[in-house]
């Protein structure tokens, strides 16, 4: 797949982009793991479930607390992905290969990798069981199992992805199909969806819409394209400041938005999508498409739904300030699998990791946690091939911006940060346990003021 060349207008911006790319290339891949998969030891001081962003980051931090030989991570996959870049992969601006490294290369040196899937959690006995039947006990448990994609809850999927006009940026199996569908677009409806469930990176479903609109303009197809965003929500974005900015972009670019529309069926042979109208029970809306981008329904992993650590919706039930489980004091959660009332993003995981590290440090010393997570999360809203609105906010859905300028404005610099600096931070700082979010930068840029 040949990526579309990013449009950067000024010489200063182009120089900045080259600098960031050079830094990323020089850094090279992480080479943190020197051991092999665990085959013998069955008890660990700290056991981490999940090898995604939260799991790897916390395994690294816990290695420093208790020693590598006392930490293990349970993760079945041989590949680790930096998923935020898939928005740009689906729009042809980045290669998929840039988003992947081997799991072996990102697990910290000396930490034991149990390459298996979690089958059962038994927090009352301080142990878990894997698919292979292995029982592993722990003193402290960190749950970082992520979120589950439920494509099968939409009639006609996932088998519908075999057809050429459907894609989804949420799966490694389908993200490149988005780019192919975009390239193959001739005329008609370009349809983008948002489901009636919690999702990871709630801005991503509309990011690909803005990028597609920009691609159509760039290739001369815009006059023949009717761009439609069907969302199950009642608003374009959950933070008013950024919602107002997005509404202006939607108006300027002539995008149609239908609220309370939830995708329930895809008819790929007819190129039709069927939506239920949430505020009109029993009513459906069938829309033909020339291109369809699907954001799937999502939920907590099945293994959590049937476990004692879950709340009524299946998410890990943690204190929203300390990330400690509400019932089991030696169990902790981080990231998408938790019921933290904030947007599920990699930026949120970074901020949570610093809080959780400090929380566990104090608990290990029989002290009360004092560091409190404020719900910080971030969503770089890509609005074009060289424009981003950098949304940052907290539990109260109020802006919590890092930079000393209005981040609701589209900026080239924020696009460069999204496309080049953030991947660098992820691979070289966050996964190594050195990046806990931009709170210290916020204080610096705002001269210590809130």
Curated annotation (Swiss-Prot):
This is Sulfide:quinone oxidoreductase, mitochondrial. It catalyses: ubiquinone-10 + hydrogen sulfide + sulfite + 2 H(+) = ubiquinol-10 + thiosulfate; a quinone + hydrogen sulfide + glutathione + H(+) = S-sulfanylglutathione + a quinol; ubiquinone-10 + hydrogen sulfide + glutathione + H(+) = S-sulfanylglutathione + ubiquinol-10. Disulfide bonds join 201-379. The gene is Sqor. It is an enzyme of class 1 (oxidoreductase). GO terms for cellular component: mitochondrial inner membrane; mitochondrion. It comes from the Eukaryota. GO terms for biological process: sulfide oxidation, using sulfide:quinone oxidoreductase.
């Amino acid at each position: 797949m040949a990526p579309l060349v990013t449009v950067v207008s000024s010489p200063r911006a182009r120089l900045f982009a080259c600098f960031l790319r050079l830094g990323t290339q020089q850094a090279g891949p992480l080479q943190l793991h020197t051991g092999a998969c665990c085959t013998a030891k069955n008890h660990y001081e700290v056991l981490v479930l999940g090898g995604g962003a939260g799991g790897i980051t916390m395994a690294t931090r816990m290695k420093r607390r208790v020693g590598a030989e006392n930490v293990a991570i349970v993760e079945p996959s041989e590949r680790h992905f930096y998923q935020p870049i898939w928005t740009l992969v689906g729009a042809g601006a980045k290669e998929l290969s840039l988003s992947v490294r081997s799991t072996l290369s990102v697990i910290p040196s000396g930490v034991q990798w149990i390459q298996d899937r979690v089958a059962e959690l038994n927090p009352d006995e301080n142990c878990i069981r894997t698919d292979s039947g292995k029982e592993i006990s722990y003193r402290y448990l960190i749950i970082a199992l992520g979120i589950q994609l439920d494509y099968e809850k939409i009639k006609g999927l996932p088998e519908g992805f075999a057809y050429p006009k459907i894609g989804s940026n949420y799966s490694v199996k389908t993200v490149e199909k988005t780019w192919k569908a975009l390239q193959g677009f001739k005329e008609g409806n370009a349809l983008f969806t948002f489901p009636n469930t919690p999702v990871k990176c709630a801005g991503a479903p509309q990011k690909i819409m803005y990028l597609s609109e920009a691609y159509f303009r760039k290739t001369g197809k815009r006059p023949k394209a009717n761009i439609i965003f069907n969302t199950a929500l009642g608003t374009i974005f959950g933070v008013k400041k950024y919602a107002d900015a997005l509404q202006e972009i939607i108006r300027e670019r002539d995008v149609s938005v239908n609220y309370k529309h939830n995708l329930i069926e895809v008819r790929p042979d007819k190129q039709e999508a069927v939506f239920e109208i949430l505020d009109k029970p029993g009513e459906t809306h069938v829309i033909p498409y020339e291109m369809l981008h699907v954001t799937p329904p999502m939920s907590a992993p099945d293994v959590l739904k049937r476990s004692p650590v879950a709340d009524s919706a299946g998410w890990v039930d943690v204190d929203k300030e300390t990330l400690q489980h509400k019932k089991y004091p030696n169990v902790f959660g981080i990231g998408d699998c938790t019921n933290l009332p904030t947007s599920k993003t990699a930026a949120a995981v970074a901020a949570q990791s610093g809080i959780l590290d400090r929380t566990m440090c104090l608990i290990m010393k029989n002290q009360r946690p004092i560091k409190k997570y404020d719900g910080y999360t971030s969503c770089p809203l890509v609005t074009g091939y060289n424009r981003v609105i950098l949304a940052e906010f907290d539990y109260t859905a109020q802006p919590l911006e890092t930079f000393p300028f209005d981040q609701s404005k589209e900026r080239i610099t924020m696009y460069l940060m999204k496309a080049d600096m953030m991947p660098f931070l992820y691979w070289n700082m966050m996964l190594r346990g050195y990046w806990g979010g931009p709170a210290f930068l916020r204080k610096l840029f705002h001269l210590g003021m809130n």
